[in-house]
From Swiss-Prot:
Signal peptide: none annotated. It is found in: Cell membrane. Part of the ABC transporter complex GlnHMPQ involved in glutamine transport. Probably responsible for the translocation of the substrate across the membrane. It comes from Bacillus subtilis (strain 168). The chain crosses the membrane at residues 21-41, 63-83, 85-105, 132-152, 181-201. This is Probable glutamine ABC transporter permease protein GlnM.
Length: 216
């Protein structure tokens, strides 16, 4: 393995690492908030919202992430809104991941005893207050493992930015590979950078899961 490729192009790798990390953090936060909102829509008693939430999840989960990315990168300019590769990839990643997070959280909410909601309502809580303060905290504890898997998938799926010049690790690796005419070594180093992101995240999720188990 030619280590000099890493050192000679270290600034490009670090730039890609930064944009991958930034896109992952933004998409993680955005997809979690959106996923919670859609999950609540799916279990609400107001049928139009329930149908809208179900349609969103089923539609987004069953089309490729690449297609969603192309819609934002190539399609929006036709409507007068232009996003650069980083923005288009991050928005697509957020929307795509939110559908899977919504399903995980919906399952978590429905696993909480219905008596919890009834008790909260009888104590004077509104539906929104009961959901926010009573149901969701319990549901989040239950769905930490599947959420952790989705967050790990999100980091790995961030490589989609490379397809639309999103400045991420894969995009920078393509540039390095083109300039050095070396392929294998370049992408092995990229894999190591991804591990720097995913291993701490995996450890953190496992730690949080154990802490939450002790709190029961």
């Amino acid at each position: 393995m030619n280590v000099s490729i890493l050192f000679d192009n270290f600034s490009m790798y670090m730039d890609g690492f930064y944009h991958t990390l930034l896109a992952s953090v933004i998409a993680l936060a955005g997809s979690f908030v959106l996923g919670v909102a859609v999950a609540v829509m799916r279990i609400t008693v107001f049928k139009p919202l329930q149908w809208l939430g179900t349609a969103y999840v089923e539609f987004i989960r069953n089309i490729p992430l690449l297609l969603i990315t192309f819609v934002f990168y190539f399609g929006l300019p036709n409507a007068g809104l232009r996003l650069d590769g980083f923005q288009a990839g991050t928005v697509a990643l957020t929307i795509y991941t939110s559908a899977f997070i919504a399903e995980a959280i919906r399952a978590g909410i429905q696993s909480v005893s219905k008596g919890q909601m009834e008790a909260a309502r009888s104590s004077g809580f509104t539906y929104s207050q009961a959901m926010l303060h009573i149901i969701l905290p319990q549901a989040i504890k239950i769905v930490i493992p599947p959420l952790g898997n989705q967050f790990l998938n999100l980091v790995k799926n961030s490589s989609i930015l490379g397809v639309v010049a999103g400045l991420d690790l894969m995009y920078q690796a393509d540039l390095v590979s083109s300039s050095t005419l070396v392929v294998f070594d370049v992408y092995i180093f990229v894999a190591l950078f991804y591990l720097v992101l995913t291993i701490p995240l995996s450890i953190g999720v496992n730690y949080l899961e154990k802490r939450l188990e002790k709190s029961y």
